[in-house]
From Swiss-Prot:
One of its GO terms (biological process) is response to heat. Induction: Induced by abscisic acid (ABA), heat, drought and high-salinity stresses. Promoted by methylviologen (MV), a superoxide radical generating drug. It comes from Arabidopsis thaliana (Mouse-ear cress). The active site is at 111. This is Galactinol synthase 1.
Length: 344
């Protein structure tokens, strides 16, 4: 086990992570990755994420896996923000008529394509409605061979189809309601929120994911359910601070230390900052208003816009472009050259 990482025997325990004293930030085969589809306003979330990673001085790039329906204008915006744009083809479940918890979840199966980005040894996936408020590059140094993510909460109404919701059981507070083994059998495996996870791209895994999807009936939470099923044997929980789902603020406030949170997931209804009105349930809370403002502070900060590094090639190109101008001035007799003294 790597230095700075401990894990108890309790299956419910999360991996405890400490920042290494000398993080290896020179690896070019690591990256963050997000997903974008369509011509809507989610591009604002991705721009905000790119600027947030820049603000916390992440050493690694942001790759945007996007479907073909993302317009050229949005692609240019993301390239101008320093993102690496990768077009991917859609992935559909075998039965599109399945009732998902949210209708748009069907397109999220396309996220499986990120497992073929094998030019990277490790990647951290982040949804476009996530913002990073502290550097999390150290997560890349966690031991290989696992998928790391934060456990989800089952207390919102979107989980009403599950036995967990019906008996008020939640893995975020397993001591409050004991799982009834006699009636329901063994408790379910730990379940992560797929808005943020650390994984290892691999072509064999990628092909097997697609094969397995073809014979797996779709379920309400689409690719999140599928990933939990597929990776349940290698999933390792990490602390809540790496993916604060906003519902935790009112469902499990005892588990949240807002001042220590590194990553915020604006997935609660009405919480996406670029659509925020404050009218939906729980959106009038002061902590929500503060987090929405915090996101906008980053998005609106022009100093965080990507600045292309000046290279020797760029400088030479500039000089070449100036030659006709200098020649014209010389011929007009308006430019006199002064021989520079020798440096010898």
């Amino acid at each position: 086990m790597a230095p700075g990482l401990t894990q108890t025997a309790d299956a419910m325990s999360t991996v405890t992570i400490t920042k290494p004293s000398l993080p290896s930030v020179q690896d070019s085969d690591r990256a963050y990755v997000t997903f974008l589809a369509g011509n809507g306003d989610y591009v604002k979330g991705v721009v905000g994420l790119a600027k947030g990673l820049r603000k916390v001085k992440s050493a690694y790039p942001l790759v945007v896996a996007m479907l073909p329906d993302v317009p050229e204008e949005h692609r240019r915006i993301l390239v101008d923000q320093g993102c690496i744009v990768r077009e991917i083809e859609p992935v559909y479940p075998p039965e599109n008529q399945t009732q998902f918890a949210m209708a748009y979840y069907v397109i999220n199966y396309s996220k499986l394509r990120i497992w073929k980005f094998v030019e990277y040894s490790k990647m951290i996936y982040l949804d476009g409605d996530i913002q990073v408020y502290e550097n999390i590059d150290h997560l890349f140094d966690l031991p290989d061979g696992y998928l790391y993510a934060v456990m989800d909460c089952f207390c919102e109404k979107t989980w009403s189809h599950t036995p967990q919701y019906k008996i008020r059981y939640c893995q975020q507070c397993p001591d409050k309601v004991q799982w009834p083994k006699a009636e329901l059998g063994e408790p379910p495996a730990l379940y992560f929120n797929a808005g943020m996870f650390l994984y290892e791209p691999n072509l064999e895994t990628y092909e097997d994911l697609l094969r397995t999807l073809k014979i797996t009936p779709p379920t309400p939470f689409a690719e999140q359910d599928f990933l939990n099923m597929y990776f349940k044997k290698i999933y390792k929980p990490i602390p809540l601070v790496y993916n604060l789902v906003l519902a935790m603020l009112w469902r499990h406030p005892e588990n949240v230390e807002l001042g220590k949170v590194k990553v915020v997931h604006y997935c609660a209804a009405g919480s996406k900052p670029w659509r925020y009105t404050g009218k939906e349930a729980n959106m009038e809370r002061e902590d929500i208003k503060m987090l929405v403002k915090k996101w906008w502070d980053i998005y609106d900060d022009e100093s965080l816009d990507y600045k292309k590094p000046v290279t020797v090639v760029d400088t030479e190109v500039d000089l070449v472009n100036l030659k006709p101008f200098i020649t014209a001035l010389t011929e007009a007799g308006r430019l006199n050259y002064v021989t520079a003294p020798s440096a010898a």
